[in-house]
Amino acid sequence: MSGPRIAAVVLAAGLSSRMGSNKLLADFHGQPLIAQTVGRIAAAGVEQIFVVTGHQAEVIKQALASAKVRFVHNDAYASGLASSLRAGVAAAKDHDALLVCLGDMPLVNSADLKRFIAAYCDDRSIVVPVKDRQLGNPVLWGKAHFKTLLSLTGDRGARSILEENRERVTEVTVTDSGVLLDADTPEALEQIRESLS
């Protein structure tokens, strides 16, 4: 019997309003930040990667031209994170579980991602990384949670669903801080850039 079919949903539709420019296109050793993120997910052996685009969709597609991904466009990206999450879940709902990833987290360790996937046990599971007692990203969601994820609205992420289902959560402790670092500010972007040097 084969294992569960797990896909990744990479959220890459946002406006980067706190950054002044599209952070996903920031250069890291000749590669856009989004390509670094997707590359680490692919290296973990994820079956299929869905990239949700919105703002500057064509430029994001160009940045990932050599990546083996499926693009999902979110016309409502300006309404907030939840619309992108819904678009990704709807496109990938035939899978048993979804690894929901932020596009601006290029330091997530591929070995840690493999451990998250290995920790998945059934359709009600939620697998979350923990570093220094802080919950990180990405989060692996079993199929039983897809309907709830599809009901999110506004700029609300899925953290509230995680809190409401704590008995189904498997925490995977990691030593790498990449699960906590996303490029939400110019300072955070610089910290990530220094970490990749």
Regions found by a protein language model. Name each.
Residues 18, 59-62, 148, 182, ...:
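Phosphate- and divalent-cation-binding pockets in alpha/beta enzyme and binding domains
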Residues 1-4, 153-197:
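Conserved alpha/beta core of the MobA/IspD/sugar-nucleotide pyrophosphorylase nucleotidyltransferase superfamily
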Residues 134-135, 139-165:
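Short, glycine-/small-residue-rich phosphate/pyrophosphate-handling segment
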Residues 109, 149-150, 193:
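Activation segment
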Residues 2-103, 107-135, 143, 167-174:
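Nucleotide and nucleotide-moiety/phosphate-recognizing core
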Residues 113, 146, 186-189:
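Short functional linear motifs
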